[in-house]
Amino acid sequence: MAHIYRLLLLLLSNLWFSAAAQNQSETEWPLHDNGLSKVVQWDHYSFQVNGQRIFIFSGEFHYWRIPVPELWRDILEKVKATGFTAFAFYSSWAYHAPNNRTVDFSTGARDITPIFELAKELGMYMIVRPGPYVNAEASAGGFPLWLTTGEYGSLRNDDPRYTAAWTPYFANMSQITSKYQVTDGHNTLVYQIENEYGQQWIGDPKDRNPNKTAVAYMELLEASALENGITVPLTSNDPNMNSKSWGSDWSNAGGNVDVAGLDSYPSCWTCDVSQCTSTNGEYVPYKVIDYYDYFQEVQPTLPSFMPEFQGGSYNPWAGPEGGCPQDTGAEFANLFYRWNIGQRVTAMSLYMLYGGTNWGAIAAPVTATSYDYSAPISEDRSIGAKYSETKLLALFTRTAKDLTMTEAIGNGTQYTTNTAVRAFELRNPQTNAGFYVTFHNDTTVGGNQAFKLHVNTSVGALTVPKNEGVIQLNGHQSKIIVTDFTLGKRTLLYSTAEVLTYAVFENRPTLVLWVPTGESGEFAIKGTKSGKVENGDGCSGINFKREKDYLVVNFSQAKGLSVLRLDNGVRVVLLDKAAAYRFWAPALTDDPIVQETETVLVHGPYLVRSASVSKSTLALRGDSVEKTTLEIFAPHSVRKITWNGKEVKTSQTPYGSLKATLAAPPTIKLPALTSWRSNDSLPERLPSYDDSGPAWIEANHMTTSNPSPPATLPVLYADEYGFHNGVRLWRGYFNGSASGVFLNIQGGSAFGWSAWLNGHFLDSHLGTATTSQANKTLTFSSSILNPTENVLLIVHDDTGHDQTTGALNPRGIIEARLLSNDTSSPAPGFTQWRIAGTAGGESNLDPIRGVFNEDGLFAERMGWHLPGFDDSAWTPENSTTSASSALSFTGATVRFFRTVVPLDIPAGLDVSISFVLSTPSAAPKGYRAQLFVNGYQYGRYNPHIGNQVVFPVPPGILDYQGDNTIGLAVWAQTEEGAGIQVDWKVNYVADSSLSVAGFGKGLRPGWTEERLKFA
């Protein structure tokens, strides 16, 4: 009876859904453009380019977090290989503007034109996001730090001072982008204005009471973009569902963009999920969010667009080593990205797709050096299960042209034979193609549920699979079941196995389907009467059953790749998940909208970067990390295969594919890290030290523009004096006696400081993961006081400027107050303060590496971290012949360790290397260390607070065919001193078209005598 009842419900619901579909198909949604061009248009369904609809599946990368331009190709080729149609990037105002007189888009890795050119070459659209504010877990949210003094107002408004500051950068960024727009045959699709600036309304957005300041600010940015040549649509991204800002469907109050979008991080943007409760509520793993109703309410005539959807999460200070990939891994990618499709989203960009590294002082205080983000492409540039899982869906969305125009017909458990499973039905009103997106009814439950699905098709209502087997949801999983799916000139009536992709060769489709290993599947193709098994690798229980208008094929797929041939010429490739992970569909065109005739199919390698056909030769570029069997499905005209420029011996299979074998790459062994030398890097603690040179500035400001004034004068905020990064040194002078000093210092989460009087160590604030300001009362022993002049040295490390409204939070000494020896006499005052920071301050002494790279340690000011510095007079450290070195000293001070190590990595390989820093078990942990590689600061190691120990350093920063200068600045914050173990390791070796040997020429300038004046 229960079964009959479900069938009756299905019949009734089918009648209602058919009527609903008819009504929806009759809806005339307006087709929008920006009034400047009709190249890019959009409507209720999706974006269109030159009249073709496109599913925008995009991912974010930050060029400024991987400052080796040759490696941008690596990242973007990996993005393209997933099947993505676009990529997005923030530009960084701070990265291009070392001071308020300079905008640099030409020096070293600041020239971003290769990114635009790669987009055209590789065939991907771009979502360009210039800010000027970008957030991004970057210091001050990407604002240049000279902006944070208060001199330019409170920021992110229409204040003329702030407007004058951002205009040169924003104009430059717009002018560069204007040369590479879709409207002129290039690939910039849209241009985002500001970032997560949900400030259009005062109070409840439903009241539509405009925030005139915010409106004016947005209009200034929009006008600047247009004045400087932007002709593609302008977009925005709401930070959450509450702000409802800048969309014309909601209101015409002013400041609106062409297409408004919504950002969402349903599993929290940080490994510390408690930080997301105010936005998402209590964290429940795999709990999904309803976006459909939001888009229907807020922007019904616009595409459902998510400029940022969760691609991972950043790891805060004190977070787990390696981040929290288990929170947003392959299962997350499988479920949440399909959930978005079920919500009718047709444009989404993953934040991040590749995170990179917070080298130098790029990071905001919320995170340490790694910006791996648990993204599909890891910080060390490797790809794994999450990348592959994302690829399974991205290739499908590139192939499923009918998915770009659908209406939501219904959803619920009535679609299935198991009430623990529900489905969302999407249907194309023009072609009647259907997409049933299935989930556990409670997505937080990850059990194994079996079911059959009630579907509407062109031959009527069916319950599938019709024959043997069931559909399974095993774990946190979703599946998209298609009906009346366009297959060239054929029709896939339905498939309970997911479609990966398809291609058409000689007018005959090759359809690729996949199921999790060991599961069964069933599909039906119209106009077919019979079929046969041509290769049964892992496939079993294959049954062909002819129906009136179609052929039903039922199968079970274990590990491997199987091939079926149908009598109407359709070839079907069946894969289990492991095989699907190694299956690729490289495009033969540079058009992001890839047609089914413009691709080949490849199985086996770790990565296929590109493919091209010339006469009878198919040229493949890619990576292999082990001995691999290469199998290719291509046009019959292809007879030869080249892999990375070399012809490989091929054989043809009985079912028409070509096979070849790729050899394993060689093993790479790194030389030992030995022959270390060291030197004292804190002479400033000594009373005899002379601070009258160019490195030092008198800190004598008696007023400040900062909205948070200090408790004592002079103003001891580092940014006031042009020193913005990391470690700054303060020398305070006073005469006569004092019993101590009260210090209150602010530096961001995980910051720290230490103090010395007349060369004698006093105390330190070691820091905690959550403390951004700390005060101490330090007592002076009479034995270390001088009767006349005394010098107090404070070494202060900050971890960047806060984001959003916290960008103006000062960095430095909030209060410095000497204490009297007795209550009857007043406390002495400081007679002078001097400050040292980055050599040259804002003058950008090293324009290649830039102002974020260095801070104020003596070693850095003197250039000890740079290639070519002569350390022959330094103290040799005990060396070993092992691959690692243990470096140690006693006493509270700063010491710099240095060695030079040659590398000779062969051409034709992509090799990834990481440094590993650790503290020996018996050594103290009260220290901070910075890792330098050929002059670049590529690691902040703080064992007292943080857990990051692995620091990837890319080729180009490392010289793979030459000498490498490795430096460590170690700041012991206690008298126990410090001990640090230094190792390095190979992450992977790939035979690759990306031959990284020789990368980075010109990016590693050496030491010059100019450094000596900053002693």
Curated annotation (Swiss-Prot):
GO terms for cellular component: extracellular region. SUPFAM superfamilies: (Trans)glycosidases, Beta-galactosidase LacA, domain 3, Galactose-binding domain-like, Glycosyl hydrolase domain. Substrate binds at Y90, N135, A136, E137, N195, Y265, Y373. It is an enzyme of class 3 (hydrolase). Glycans are attached at N23, N100, N172, N211, N411, N441, N456, N554, N679, N735, N775, N821, N878. Disulfide bonds join C271-C324. Coiled coil: none annotated. Pfam families: BetaGal_ABD2, BetaGal_dom2, BetaGal_dom3, Glyco_hydro_35. Residues 1-21 form the signal peptide. Its EC number is 3.2.1.23. The active site is at E196 (proton donor), E308 (nucleophile). One of its GO terms (biological process) is polysaccharide catabolic process. Keywords: Carbohydrate metabolism, Disulfide bond, Glycoprotein, Glycosidase, Hydrolase, Polysaccharide degradation, Secreted, Signal. GO terms for molecular function: beta-galactosidase activity. It is found in: Secreted. SMART domains: BetaGal_dom2 (SM01029). It catalyses: Hydrolysis of terminal non-reducing beta-D-galactose residues in beta-D-galactosides. Cleaves beta-linked terminal galactosyl residues from gangliosides, glycoproteins, and glycosaminoglycans. Belongs to the glycosyl hydrolase 35 family. PANTHER family: BETA-GALACTOSIDASE RELATED. This is Probable beta-galactosidase B. It comes from Neosartorya fischeri (strain ATCC 1020 / DSM 3700 / CBS 544.65 / FGSC A1164 / JCM 1740 / NRRL 181 / WB 181). The gene is lacB.
